[in-house]
Amino acid sequence: MAGSGNDRVPAPSFNPWTAAYEYAVDAWQRGVLYADVMRQRGNQYHDHMAKRAPNVLSMEYELVLDGRELPRPVNYGLLRIKPPEGVTVDPIKRPFLVVDPRAGHGPGIGGFKPEGEMGVAVGAGHSPHFATFLPQPVPTQTVEDVMKAEAHFLEEIIARHPDAEGKPVVVANCQAGWQIMMTAAVRPELFGPIIIAGAPLSYWAGWRGMNPMRYAGGLLGGSWLTALTSDLGDGKFDGAWLVQNFENLNPANTLWSKQYNLYSKVDTEAGRYLSFEKWWGGHVFLNGPEIQYIVDNLFVGNRLSTAGLVTSDGIRIDLRNIRSPVVVFCSKGDNITPPPQTLGWIPDLYQDDAEVLAHDQTIVYAVHESIGHLGIFVSGSVARKEHQEFTSNIEMIDVLPPGIYQAEIADKTPDTP
């Protein structure tokens, strides 16, 4: 039998003193837990950087080549990733090489999550390899030396996979993208399909009034600041300055949003926060001549997308010499490397489609609508969708006739065949 309207349970009375007390206790507890996470972050940093070769890879690995032992030594190394228990690789399938950016942070973000770029390659049965690097550079190493080391790594991978059906697939993120493209332009015979994610290649390109990183470079007046910083560092450039550039793009997130997100979810967020901060705070160094070469020739000089770079051996670095299919993955939400910078090299080098065909070049590009710069190669959802599609269709991409193709990757629906 329904009760009358007078049978309602009365609402509890509001006591401001009780509410204030409960709020104060909650804030105190959150503050203590937040401070403890900060303590863990500091200890984690010291433990991480004390390692001989710190990285954030989620899979076990073994060292195959030490770049310090090459004829022109560098601080890079080639790792063979050990597949997880229960996963087998197919010796017939192309091996994969994932190369992470040396742009302030340490290595491993390409294999940071089990479902990331590395995990996708392993899950598809490919033999995975990773190009890592140490926090400190070899005193004499140059950008060209790193290119030669990458070529050595690919030669070693090819030698170890004589039954593979093709040359290695190379996945290069951010800074590693332009460096791998330079290597491929000089040694095209070593490369299978190349996937570059969030990699700047045309440095003057961009949308008017957008992407403040471009404007910051112009306002600071050229490369004098990197030269000064390297001098102050006794010939080394601290990668923490590059990370600071990331932070300065969104001070509200740096100073408030990221910290408040941890504070408000401190019971559940600590693990994710600490795992990301291990990579975000693990800074590395570059030699002064390395960063000066990068700034003068690429970001200020824009000589890569105009075939204006010449090696010390007299070889012109012309991206039109690349014989492998190039997959370019970028995002409209990337304010570090917006689509004009990732794709602008194509109109810089080719007047029309006929020139692309004449150079026998295959270019596939995909533009995400919203993901940020790091999400292009860190996000689990992007790995499960875009990177999964690139990997599973890599053989089809390899046999595409020359030309420029746009890849549109959509979610499956009930009507999808």
List the model feature ranges, each with a label.
Residues 171-180:
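Gly/Ala-rich beta-loop-alpha elbow adjacent to hydrolase catalytic centers
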Residues 50-137:
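Short, surface-exposed "cap/lid" segments of acyl-processing enzymes
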Residues 322, 328-330, 334:
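Short beta-strand/loop motif that positions the catalytic acidic residue
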